[in-house]
């Protein structure tokens, strides 16, 4: 009991990566809820002598926030997906170049084509920040879809860890400065169905260089994280970056 009392007496003098405001509110792990997980987080901080956290440290619950990963380009990534209210949220699923969700995702329903892959409109090499960018439309001009180069930079410069956060499985990307983001393995939509929940499929704003009907995106599962290309009609989440 004396040891426990001493630990709590030292609490005000210890250094934490969690914000002081969050600790005072009881939301130690800054996940937006005060529950038993905060008790566990506080005990780990005290007993392990470490204030390091496992997930993005947002200053409040008013997402999105910018997360600095220490990437060479200086690119800052959003803490959550377009349409999500927290890092673990899947958010919306969007066809490439469309800015609204819908019930069916196929070539016929894809408004940027005439109903077939051959009739896809060429929207330009990179739609990031344009009228076709769902991040810019939904969040404003300070945000945009990442380019394929920014996704490649993320993959090449971050340590990837497969983790579970608030019930959501996904990938934690840890940057050179130990900043990090969590991307839920939200799957993708094809037709009227959701497929491959447990893997991550995220759009970039960059059209595929060889075929107009494809665009680049991020793919990851528990074993790999790579830049890949997808048919543009598919419904996939978007994780924005700052302009």
Where are these regions (language model features)?
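Hydrophobic side chains within alpha-helical segments
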Residues: 6, 38-41, 153
């Amino acid at each position: 009991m004396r040891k426990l009392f001493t630990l709590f007496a030292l609490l005000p003098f210890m250094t934490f990566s969690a914000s002081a405001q969050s600790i005072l509110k009881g939301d130690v792990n800054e996940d937006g809820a005060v529950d038993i997980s905060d008790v566990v987080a506080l005990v780990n901080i005290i007993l392990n002598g470490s204030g390091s956290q496992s997930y993005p440290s947002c200053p409040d619950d008013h997402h999105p926030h910018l997360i600095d990963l220490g990437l060479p380009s200086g690119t800052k990534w959003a803490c959550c997906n377009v349409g999500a209210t927290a890092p673990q949220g899947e958010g919306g699923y969007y066809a490439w170049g469309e800015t609204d969700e819908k019930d069916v995702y196929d070539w016929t329903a894809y408004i940027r084509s005439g109903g077939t892959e051959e009739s896809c409109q060429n929207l330009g090499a990179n739609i990031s920040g344009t009228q076709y960018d769902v991040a810019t439309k939904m969040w404003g001009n300070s945000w945009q879809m990442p380019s394929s180069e920014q996704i490649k930079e993320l993959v090449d410069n971050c340590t990837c860890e497969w983790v579970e956060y608030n019930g959501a499985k996904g990938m934690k990307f840890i940057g050179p400065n130990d900043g990090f983001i969590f991307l839920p393995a939200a799957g993708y939509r094809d037709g009227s169905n959701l497929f491959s929940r447990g893997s991550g499929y995220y759009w970039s704003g960059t059209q595929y260089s060889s075929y107009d009907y494809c665009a680049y995106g991020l793919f990851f599962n528990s074993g790999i994280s790579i830049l890949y290309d997808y048919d543009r009609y598919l419904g996939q989440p978007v994780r924005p970056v700052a302009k």
